[in-house]
Design a protein with these regions (language model features):
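Generic alpha-helix initiation/capping and coil-helix boundary signal
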Residues: 19, 86-87, 238
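Secreted/periplasmic proteins
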Residues: 2-5, 9, 29-194, 199-203, ...
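Extracytoplasmic
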Residues: 201-265
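Sec-dependent N-terminal signal peptides
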Residues: 10-22
């Protein structure tokens, strides 16, 4: 799915002139980008669970008191059971696999669908988290190893192993709570950031979008993903500043739609 977390993307900026932005809108945003579809739900061999309700706002960190053994190190398991989470959020989760299997994830390691890992746009790479399925109330610890999902309305993508661990595999998607227990870097400060825009099956269309963006954002670039929508355009602000990346998202999203603040480290 991704970049070199390079993907996951999650200097003082220059002032952009209004004419430059108008050129951008005219040249690059006539056609909505093609977005990657959610994975097909595997055929159930038992009655499928009822459709999940929309996720509620997080009521705050909730310590985990039980956690199945296996899949994560005993050290990680003991850390989660003996510490409160430092950050929590609610959102929608799904799982991903082929054609990502065998290719490098954003952390530079080969993607494994049997590992308890997940993709998130803004949590620091390597963060230790617990994901709880709010429909089945099953939970599992895992590590952030990739960037994404770059699909509207989704907060986190799980490997097949992670999805099975929380009862999400046959559901396809479900509301979840994400509790963060350990991060190699601060969540809210620092970091290197970019903005990912558009999802294209055609490299030619991605290059056209890049050309339009270059007029206002000289550091725009096209990157290739493993997936149905294989090409994305990424803008890196000067200094990889989060504040400037957020400003770019606000400028681009009203017309482009698929613009995602993404952490690189």
């Amino acid at each position: 799915m991704r970049p070199d977390r390079a993907a996951r993307g999650r200097g003082p900026g220059a002032l952009w002139a209004a004419p430059a932005l108008l050129v951008l809108l005219a040249a690059g945003c006539r056609h909505p980008p093609q977005t990657a579809a959610a994975p097909a739900t595997p055929p159930p061999d038992e009655p499928a669970p009822a459709a999940p309700a929309a996720p509620e706002a997080s009521s705050g960190p909730i310590p985990v008191t039980e956690l199945p053994a296996g899949g994560i190190s005993e050290e990680d398991r003991e850390f989660v059971l003996s510490h409160p989470p430092i950050y929590s959020e609610n959102g929608q989760a799904t799982w991903y696999v082929a054609p990502y299997k065998g290719r490098k994830a954003a952390n530079g390691q080969v993607f494994r669908d049997d590992a308890l890992t997940a993709a998130h746009r803004t949590l620091p790479m390597g963060s230790l988290i617990v994901v709880t399925n709010l429909t089945t109330h099953q939970a599992s610890a895992m590590r952030i190893s990739d960037r994404g999902p770059f699909v509207p309305g989704r907060s986190i993508d799980l490997t097949i192993a992670s999805a099975k661990a929380i009862g999400l595999y046959r559901m396809g998607t479900a509301p979840v709570r994400i509790d963060v227990y350990q991060t190699p870097k601060p969540i809210e400060t620092g970091g290197r950031w970019c903005v990912q825009i558009g999802a294209f099956k055609s490299q030619e269309r991605a290059e056209k979008m890049k050309s339009a963006l270059l007029r206002a954002y000289p550091r725009a670039n096209v990157i290739e993903f493993s997936g149905e929508a294989s090409f994305w355009v990424r803008i890196r602000p000067l200094g990889d500043s989060r504040e400037e990346a957020e400003r770019i998202v606000r400028r681009v999203r009203p017309t482009q739609g698929d613009a995602y603040l993404t952490r690189l480290d």
